[in-house]
Amino acid sequence: MASQVSQMPSSSPLSSNKDEMRPKADFQPSIWGDLFLNCPDKNIDAETEKRHQQLKEEVRKMIVAPMANSTQKLAFIDSVQRLGVSYHFTKEIEDELENIYHNNNDAENDLYTTSIRFRLLREHGYNVSCDVFNKFKDEQGNFKSSVTSDVRGLLELYQASYLRVHGEDILDEAISFTTHHLSLAVASLDHPLSEEVSHALKQSIRRGLPRVEARHYLSVYQDIESHNKALLEFAKIDFNMLQFLHRKELSEICRWWKDLDFQRKLPYARDRVVEGYFWISGVYFEPQYSLGRKMLTKVIAMASIVDDTYDSYATYEELIPYTNAIERWDIKCIDEIPEYMKPSYKALLDVYEEMVQLVAEHGRQYRVEYAKNAMIRLAQSYLVEAKWTLQNYKPSFEEFKANALPTCGYAMLAITSFVGMGDIVTPETFKWAASDPKIIQASTIICRFMDDVAEHKFKHRREDDCSAIECYMEEYGVTAQEAYDVFNKHVESAWKDLNQEFLKPTEMPTEVLNRSLNLARVMDVLYREGDGYTYVGKAAKGGITSLLIEPIAL
């Protein structure tokens, strides 16, 4: 990860004659202070909880009830999903979509219905052919000019295009076509359609974080004249109930973090535990994954500390015994590493030992071994980067990529995310994940290449660090912008791979695959305008505020 260099002040707790001139990343302190240390009072009373259950049953009945046509059914299911409450109705929605998949006359559908049907079915793994859009093209192979006046249809085609896989040229064309015409139309549209279009052009449904998108759509949906009052009320209550649960979890994590006292002991490291929780709540937000969220947040917090130790403070000579200690994973190794490394090493081992204790009741200790091995591989990759920096070595782009992909940490996070899941995860799941399957490769490429572009474009990297963009520019003799374009094409290709892996039959259950999808979504949200984790950009601030601070008025 990136850092900007300054000298370690002589007053630092880590300062000595040996390391007064150490490079240190000039990271901002946490912008949240102790805001999340204490959990707020419960914002839902017993009467509201009872109302929540009543509304839940009402919505369930509406999902399965016959409607006038498939367009109404699709639109209602879409609203349920976009409002963030579809996790309550997984089976009902799946049954309805399966029925729509097998019983539908595509020839009669307009652009809106064709597009929303395509998107929803693709989201649920149905391999709907993109040929359904051919009827909206003219004899010259261009989209008909008549569709440009159908703004809602264009908006749905735009959203559907983000579910494309390799070889679907018509959807590649649709992205450009709809983006152009929606951009022209947005200023003349009335609210709330204008807000829907404006937001979509910034963030597609497919690549947005479900909770962030739900929070935004709640404010839009209530202004749609035809909105369903029961669904809206249910979604608002459900949002606040989840927010309270998430605040409780974050409060517990913040107390753990404060007790570690890394702000004083390790002043070179980023204090981003709140942003880390936001990241992981993007991986899975549902109540049943509370344990997984807390464990994975602690892991990403420790991975961030380990990363900063390698990247922003330690000498290569210190990193060799530190890496050896991580490889051996034994508290006895603590005597072999420098004094300042001991707190982070002990905390790292403690986090994984706590994981063992938490999953032992269900005989799932084996899962933690896979998680440990993934962390060890991450540390080993960090050491390679540190060696390159020491030697001022400029690897070829392919050599750099082979090591840089593991250093983004996404394979480690994907594997570790499975530890806190239920019976849907088996030993075969971990064997599959450890084999570097295509979907984990895809999310890793999205992470690595978006990070590389953000670091270089926004100058978030130390001058002595090896840069993927610089490697590519030097090897191929291209400008920075040309390199960005190549990297962005790799990201788009990886998204197509990721979409392909969701089409039935899948290698693993959708709930397993969703972890990689959501990890990719976090990158799209946080890193499109720079490193939004390290430098806490607008997306992170806005997301944390709307999801964890501000409840919805009922």
Swiss-Prot record:
CDD domains in UniProt: Terpene_cyclase_plant_C1
The protein's Enzyme Commission number: 4.2.3.13
Short sequence motif named DDXXD motif, residue ranges: 307-311
Region (Disordered): 1-23
Binding residues for Mg(2+) 1: 307, 311
Residues annotated as binding Mg(2+) 3: 451, 455
SUPFAM superfamilies: Terpenoid cyclases/Protein prenyltransferases (SSF48239), Terpenoid synthases (SSF48576)
Disulfide bonds, paired cysteine numbers: none
Pathway(s) where this gene product acts: Secondary metabolite biosynthesis; terpenoid biosynthesis
Entry keyword annotation includes ATP-binding: no
Binding site for Mg(2+) 2: 307, 311
Note on how the cofactor is bound: Binds 3 Mg(2+) ions per subunit.
Any Gene Ontology biological process: diterpenoid biosynthetic process
InterPro entries the record matches: Isoprenoid_synthase_dom_sf (IPR008949), Terpene_cyclase_plant_C1 (IPR044814), Terpene_synth_N (IPR001906), Terpene_synth_N_sf (IPR036965), Terpene_synthase-like (IPR050148), Terpene_synthase_metal-bd (IPR005630), Terpenoid_cyclase/PrenylTrfase (IPR008930)
Database matches in Pfam families: Terpene_synth, Terpene_synth_C
Enzyme class of the recorded protein, top EC level: lyase
Outcome, altering residue 308 to A: Reduces affinity for substrate about 12-fold
Compositional bias (Low complexity): 1-16
Cofactor field: Mg(2+)
Keyword entries, A-Z: Lyase, Magnesium, Metal-binding
Catalytic reactions of this protein: (2E,6E)-farnesyl diphosphate = (1S,8aR)-delta-cadinene + diphosphate
GO molecular function, one term: (+)-delta-cadinene synthase activity
Role, per record: Responsible for the cyclization of trans,trans-farnesyl diphosphate (FPP) to (+)-delta cadinene.
UniProt family annotation: Belongs to the terpene synthase family.
Domain free text: The Asp-Asp-Xaa-Xaa-Asp/Glu (DDXXD/E) motif is important for the catalytic activity, presumably through binding to Mg(2+).
Protein name according to UniProt: (+)-delta-cadinene synthase isozyme XC1
Native organism: Gossypium arboreum
